[in-house]
């Protein structure tokens, strides 16, 4: 491996809906077998992956079983109940203590000219889950009428004016490339992928991570 553990300070996991969640989860789990970032941040689906990577015992089988038991109870637009139920079950009661200072959740501050903001401290598990919901908040889709979440008054960072500039502050970025753009890409992101496809995405993420961690260019800030 060409990269030493102490060289990685800040890791960012980008969003991209359900496909990116499974891919990035596989990528991140494999990466942490070789490299230990001091700080992990994420936005949208990437924020969910980021918090799960703080839990060494979190495994693909357990997350998939919980996710697919929950997703059957939710319709296409009920993303918030899915996030709250899944994260409520898999995150420990003291997750806020584990995460404080080690995890960053990136939001789009709708009331501040759509600038990115990053939250790094929480007082409870419930508050952290509220923040995860805000990071995944898509106007009019989450609850049908609001343009931002109720607790943080924010939305998915993909709607931020300065997301690209904000991500430059990170040493490495995990992202899933996509073939389509526009409305097709949006639809692909919000529809849960079948379990078999999720397994494939996790596997491909693991393979990509194993390759990148051994062939990374020292001048690059992306694992893709």
Name what the model sees in each region:
Residues 1-43, 51-224:
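Patatin-like phospholipase
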